[in-house]
Design a protein with these regions (language model features):
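Catalytic phosphate/metal-binding cores of nucleic-acid and nucleotide-processing enzymes, i.e., regions
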Residues: 1-140
Length: 140
């Protein structure tokens, strides 16, 4: 972008205005990764739908969500203790790569409390959200 006008004189005001407009339409470069901590076991269908809503909320807020409880049940069996423990371990490893931990919901499950304890131990910033932040997630 050239800061000179048509007559080749410097026109910094117009140049800066154009730069500002271009910035508005470009996606933000840096998006911190956040670990999504929410219930999964119990009502798995409803809890997974809620977790997807929480992830969508994180994206709208400018973050990259990481929700291992949406990924690992795709190939690990939550009902088998060894595989559940492996999934929890891998989730904690993924948490170490995250900038913050976001805790959603009114209930703190046993798995969530383990994740929160690990986040505190690692010195991660923990944010608590009580209500569902996103209700327009389309399942289709």
């Amino acid at each position: 972008m050239n800061y000179l006008n048509d007559e080749h004189y410097p026109d910094y005001t117009a140049w800066q205005a154009i730069i500002n407009v271009e910035r508005e339409f470009k996606p933000k470069g840096f998006r911190p990764i956040v670990f999504i901590c929410s219930p999964y076991a119990g009502d798995v269908k409803a809890n997974a739908a809620n977790a997807r809503s929480y992830c969508r909320f994180a994206v709208k807020m400018g973050y990259i969500p990481m929700a291992p409880h949406l990924l690992f049940p795709q190939f690990l069996h939550d009902k088998k203790l060894a595989e559940r423990n492996l999934g929890m371990y891998m989730g904690l490893v993924m948490m170490s790569k995250c900038h913050e931990v976001w805790v959603f919901g009114d209930t703190i499950t046993k798995g969530m409390s383990m994740e929160i304890a690990k986040a505190k131990y690692k010195g991660k910033k923990i944010r608590y959200f009580k209500a569902i932040m996103e209700a327009d997630y389309d399942e289709a």
